[in-house]
């Protein structure tokens, strides 16, 4: 799925989580006017005016104003979730997807969960307890991985663009399926055929190869 585990993690833990904390730790007025919310609205070209005029008065002194601010805060929250949440998640994903060190740590944590899964509960997904079935990688994912990894083997650095050699490209799991890995887009890396076949079934070899722009 193009909606990767990392996308979901960003939305639920980094985006919705921050929003939830802001709501429960502040009054409606403080929540609406907090720098965090205003900065996010401005980042994506919005202002609070898109949901209406700011209420007047001070909610801590008047229950009527408190209800007005609460209603306005709910509108801000709703607009945020419908229009900003997904955009922000994509921005964060764009940065994290290029960081192999982060992806390795992320997939290592995911593997801890996968290892506890039982085939009896997920017969269509698991090969056996704690091991996900292998899946073919769609063309869109292969293109994305090649673009991110700059057409180079992520273990030896060999060029796999076909310009300088004819080495066969392979798409490899950073955290192997046999060790709790998944077929998720964020767990796939580009390798040459030699390096891929040289790895053991449980090998977690990877390198965070950084190719400078100049």
Put a short name on every predicted segment.
Residues 158-190, 205, 210-211:
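Histidine-centered nuclease catalytic patch
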Residues 110-158:
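Short, charged surface segments at domain edges that flank catalytic/cofactor-binding sites
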Residues 1-129, 207-214:
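Extended charged
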Residues 157, 193-196:
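Cys/His-coordinated zinc-binding microdomains
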Residues 177, 195-198:
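Hydrophobic alpha-helical segments
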Residues 161, 197-200:
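Short functional micro-motifs and their immediate structural scaffolds
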